[in-house]
Amino acid sequence: RTVCPNNEIITDNAGKPSVMVYTPKFTMKEMIAGGSDRVHPAFVVNGVERDGFYISKYQNTEIDGRGYSLPAEIPRNCVGFDLSRSKCTAKGRGWHLTTIQEWGAIALWCKKNGHLPYGNNDYGKDKRENMYRAIRVSNVETGKGRVLTGTGPLSWSHDHTVAGIW
């Protein structure tokens, strides 16, 4: 909890934690000038309007065949859709892959609030920020620039704070 004081720690059916960021419900007009009073589709699940949703703070790492959102871990990569989905649903009720609607809501929020998150696009750093680097997974991975989850600068977070989505 010390590393992520403004986030939620949610456990799965195996009792293992994931760090999650809560996104409260908003309407289209709150994000887009001239938008409608409709609630953004990310907040409507099976026809039921929700107050918000949780999204993984970090790219997931794999523990015991399941995905977990944890800081300073090696992110799982090269996983196909079906395997990714099974790793999420194995965690129990309510766990799912992030939907296109949820990513859309996050993108609209970022645009509205003037935040364009940076990220690892140059072997552990962002090409736009030469001074900042994340912690590389391994310096011996020739040609690979993967970094430990959440170790980049604040500009890599969706809201540019420690509480954001990395």
Where are these regions (language model features)?
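N-terminal module-boundary/linker segments of secreted carbohydrate-active enzymes
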Residues: R1-A42
